[in-house]
Protein backbone atom coordinates (compact mmCIF):
# COMPACT_ATOMS: atom_id res chain seq x y z
CA UNK A 1 0.00 0.00 0.00
CA UNK A 2 1.02 3.62 -0.21
CA UNK A 3 1.89 4.30 3.39
CA UNK A 4 1.22 0.76 4.60
CA UNK A 5 2.44 -2.72 3.85
CA UNK A 6 1.51 -6.39 4.04
CA UNK A 7 3.23 -6.84 7.40
CA UNK A 8 1.08 -4.32 9.26
CA UNK A 9 -0.36 -5.57 12.53
CA UNK A 10 -3.88 -6.10 11.16
CA UNK A 11 -2.90 -7.98 8.01
CA UNK A 12 -0.20 -10.04 9.70
CA UNK A 13 -2.53 -11.15 12.49
CA UNK A 14 -5.42 -11.86 10.12
CA UNK A 15 -3.16 -13.99 7.95
CA UNK A 16 -2.00 -15.93 11.00
CA UNK A 17 -5.45 -16.43 12.55
CA UNK A 18 -7.92 -16.86 9.69
CA UNK A 19 -6.61 -20.14 8.26
CA UNK A 20 -7.07 -21.82 11.64
CA UNK A 21 -10.37 -20.27 12.73
CA UNK A 22 -12.17 -20.01 9.39
CA UNK A 23 -10.43 -22.50 7.08
CA UNK A 24 -9.38 -19.71 4.72
CA UNK A 25 -6.25 -19.27 2.64
CA UNK A 26 -4.76 -15.78 2.89
CA UNK A 27 -2.53 -14.12 0.31
CA UNK A 28 -0.86 -10.87 1.36
CA UNK A 29 1.17 -8.76 -1.03
CA UNK A 30 2.72 -5.33 -1.23
CA UNK A 31 1.89 -2.98 -4.04
CA UNK A 32 4.70 -1.68 -6.22
CA UNK A 33 7.23 0.59 -4.57
CA UNK A 34 6.47 -0.51 -1.00
CA UNK A 35 9.12 -1.41 1.54
CA UNK A 36 8.23 -3.68 4.43
CA UNK A 37 10.13 -5.83 6.94
CA UNK A 38 10.19 -8.59 4.31
CA UNK A 39 11.88 -6.38 1.71
CA UNK A 40 11.03 -3.93 -1.05
CA UNK A 41 8.74 -4.57 -3.99
CA UNK A 42 9.74 -3.55 -7.49
CA UNK A 43 8.43 -0.46 -9.23
CA UNK A 44 7.20 2.88 -8.03
CA UNK A 45 3.91 4.09 -6.58
CA UNK A 46 1.36 4.31 -9.40
CA UNK A 47 -1.34 6.45 -7.73
CA UNK A 48 -3.85 3.61 -7.79
CA UNK A 49 -3.58 3.12 -11.56
CA UNK A 50 -0.51 0.93 -11.97
CA UNK A 51 -1.48 -1.06 -8.88
CA UNK A 52 -4.17 -2.56 -11.08
CA UNK A 53 -1.43 -4.84 -12.43
CA UNK A 54 -0.34 -5.86 -8.93
CA UNK A 55 -3.88 -6.93 -8.14
CA UNK A 56 -4.08 -8.80 -11.45
CA UNK A 57 -0.87 -10.69 -10.65
CA UNK A 58 -2.21 -11.66 -7.22
CA UNK A 59 -5.49 -12.85 -8.73
CA UNK A 60 -3.58 -14.86 -11.34
CA UNK A 61 -1.72 -16.56 -8.48
CA UNK A 62 -5.07 -17.37 -6.83
CA UNK A 63 -6.46 -18.77 -10.09
CA UNK A 64 -3.37 -20.92 -10.74
CA UNK A 65 -3.89 -22.58 -7.39
CA UNK A 66 -7.64 -23.01 -7.96
CA UNK A 67 -8.44 -21.32 -4.67
CA UNK A 68 -12.23 -21.18 -4.35
CA UNK A 69 -14.34 -18.07 -3.80
CA UNK A 70 -11.66 -15.38 -3.46
CA UNK A 71 -12.51 -12.24 -1.54
CA UNK A 72 -10.51 -9.04 -1.75
CA UNK A 73 -9.63 -7.05 1.33
CA UNK A 74 -8.12 -3.60 1.05
CA UNK A 75 -7.05 -1.33 3.86
CA UNK A 76 -6.78 2.42 3.32
CA UNK A 77 -5.09 2.87 -0.08
CA UNK A 78 -5.81 -0.79 -0.80
CA UNK A 79 -9.55 -0.01 -0.73
CA UNK A 80 -9.04 2.36 -3.65
CA UNK A 81 -7.46 -0.43 -5.71
CA UNK A 82 -10.26 -2.83 -4.76
CA UNK A 83 -12.98 -0.33 -5.71
CA UNK A 84 -11.34 0.70 -8.99
CA UNK A 85 -10.10 -2.67 -10.25
CA UNK A 86 -11.63 -5.47 -8.18
CA UNK A 87 -14.56 -6.08 -10.50
CA UNK A 88 -12.14 -7.04 -13.30
CA UNK A 89 -11.63 -10.35 -11.48
CA UNK A 90 -13.80 -13.33 -10.53
CA UNK A 91 -14.30 -12.56 -6.85
CA UNK A 92 -16.90 -13.66 -4.32
CA UNK A 93 -16.86 -10.35 -2.44
CA UNK A 94 -14.79 -7.48 -1.13
CA UNK A 95 -14.05 -5.94 2.25
CA UNK A 96 -12.97 -2.32 2.60
CA UNK A 97 -11.15 -1.52 5.83
CA UNK A 98 -10.88 2.22 6.52
CA UNK A 99 -11.75 3.26 2.94
CA UNK A 100 -10.46 6.61 1.76
CA UNK A 101 -12.61 7.33 -1.31
CA UNK A 102 -9.95 9.71 -2.64
CA UNK A 103 -9.15 7.97 -5.92
CA UNK A 104 -12.26 5.83 -6.35
CA UNK A 105 -14.85 7.78 -8.30
CA UNK A 106 -18.63 7.81 -8.05
CA UNK A 107 -18.62 5.72 -11.26
CA UNK A 108 -16.39 3.13 -9.55
CA UNK A 109 -18.92 2.89 -6.72
CA UNK A 110 -21.90 2.68 -9.08
CA UNK A 111 -20.25 -0.28 -10.84
CA UNK A 112 -20.38 -2.22 -7.57
CA UNK A 113 -24.09 -1.43 -7.22
CA UNK A 114 -25.02 -3.56 -10.19
CA UNK A 115 -22.39 -6.24 -9.74
CA UNK A 116 -24.21 -8.62 -7.40
CA UNK A 117 -20.93 -9.00 -5.50
CA UNK A 118 -21.07 -8.42 -1.73
CA UNK A 119 -19.25 -5.29 -0.58
CA UNK A 120 -18.52 -4.66 3.11
CA UNK A 121 -17.09 -1.33 4.28
CA UNK A 122 -15.71 -1.19 7.83
CA UNK A 123 -15.59 2.43 8.97
CA UNK A 124 -13.81 3.62 12.13
CA UNK A 125 -15.78 6.11 14.22
CA UNK A 126 -12.81 8.49 14.40
CA UNK A 127 -11.22 7.84 11.00
CA UNK A 128 -8.89 10.54 9.72
CA UNK A 129 -10.29 10.35 6.19
CA UNK A 130 -13.86 8.99 6.11
CA UNK A 131 -16.16 8.77 9.11
CA UNK A 132 -19.42 6.80 9.30
CA UNK A 133 -21.83 9.66 8.47
CA UNK A 134 -19.90 10.66 5.35
CA UNK A 135 -19.45 7.00 4.42
CA UNK A 136 -23.23 6.49 4.47
CA UNK A 137 -23.62 9.45 2.09
CA UNK A 138 -20.80 8.44 -0.26
CA UNK A 139 -21.79 4.76 -0.40
CA UNK A 140 -25.50 5.55 -0.91
CA UNK A 141 -25.04 4.76 -4.62
CA UNK A 142 -24.32 1.13 -3.62
CA UNK A 143 -27.63 0.12 -2.01
CA UNK A 144 -26.44 -3.36 -1.01
CA UNK A 145 -23.19 -2.27 0.65
CA UNK A 146 -22.88 -3.45 4.23
CA UNK A 147 -21.54 -0.51 6.22
CA UNK A 148 -20.09 -1.41 9.60
CA UNK A 149 -19.29 1.55 11.86
CA UNK A 150 -16.88 0.65 14.64
CA UNK A 151 -17.18 2.72 17.81
CA UNK A 152 -13.96 4.08 19.24
CA UNK A 153 -11.82 3.01 16.28
CA UNK A 154 -9.36 5.11 14.28
CA UNK A 155 -7.89 4.64 10.80
CA UNK A 156 -4.93 2.52 11.96
CA UNK A 157 -6.90 0.18 14.29
CA UNK A 158 -4.40 0.44 17.14
CA UNK A 159 -4.79 -1.94 20.08
CA UNK A 160 -5.51 -5.64 20.42
CA UNK A 161 -9.23 -5.08 21.12
CA UNK A 162 -9.73 -3.30 17.79
CA UNK A 163 -7.45 -5.71 15.96
CA UNK A 164 -9.64 -8.59 17.14
CA UNK A 165 -12.79 -6.75 16.00
CA UNK A 166 -11.38 -6.38 12.54
Language-model features: where?
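Gly/Ala-rich beta-loop-alpha elbow adjacent to hydrolase catalytic centers
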Residues: 73-82
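Active-site nucleophile loop of the alpha/beta-hydrolase fold
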Residues: 96-104, 124-126
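Catalytic histidine neighborhood in serine/cysteine hydrolases
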Residues: 140-156
